[in-house]
Amino acid sequence: MSCLPALDKFLQNYHQAYLTSLGELLRYYPQGEASVCIQGEFHADLDQAVSWQPVKREVEGSFANVEHALELTLWPEINHFYGQYFSAPLLFDSEWGTGELLQVWNEDDFTCLQQNLIGHLMMKKKLKQPPTWFIGLLDEGDKMLTINNSDGSVWIELPGEIPTQQLSPSLAEFIGALSPRIAPPVKHEELPMPALEHPGIFASFKRMWQNLFGKR
């Protein structure tokens, strides 16, 4: 079962939750990065939050280059989850705690995602662990949310370790169990690692990647 209907619904609920509770659009700090998601004026030189909303991509994002580089077939849900929309990260509440679902802000962000996904999968191979790919963070970034690439199930994963706690048998069911979390926009800190400087998707991976690199 594709996760796309569940993702569509969550995005609709997410947008509506902010309109209903705050009477305004979603807000996000793009840190100088343009995006079709931005509503209203955008000035790259101004350090301020912008109004935004998710935008369906005209051309679906593809991970064929990642599969080719790693000689690995990825679970097809990766295309539905990351390749359908441009969006800021999505905050959520759940029975497992608070967290965020990662999304891509623009094409540069998508390229950054692919590069870091390759790095993650190469690390899994180096550690002789089954391949996984990340979809988000739990508990303020202390834990990764990952997909088991062999069957599409959702797990909690600590950097450098094999996932031990399954949350859902599918990404569709997992997304369906989440509730939008309303919170003010937070400006992400600059990261010292060049590969992670892009402010869209990987600012949220600060602790995760520091821990991961520390285990090499």
Swiss-Prot record:
Family of this protein: Belongs to the Syd family.
A Gene Ontology cellular-component term: cytoplasmic side of plasma membrane
Gene encoding the protein: syd
Segments forming a coiled coil: none
Xref: InterPro entries: Syd (IPR009948), Syd_sf (IPR038228)
Membrane topology: Peripheral membrane protein
Keyword annotations: Cell inner membrane, Cell membrane, Membrane
Domain of life: Bacteria
Native source organism of the sequence: Shewanella baltica (strain OS185)
Subcellular location as annotated: Cell inner membrane
Protein name: Protein Syd
Function statement: Interacts with the SecY protein in vivo. May bind preferentially to an uncomplexed state of SecY, thus functioning either as a chelating agent for excess SecY in the cell or as a regulatory factor that negatively controls the translocase function.
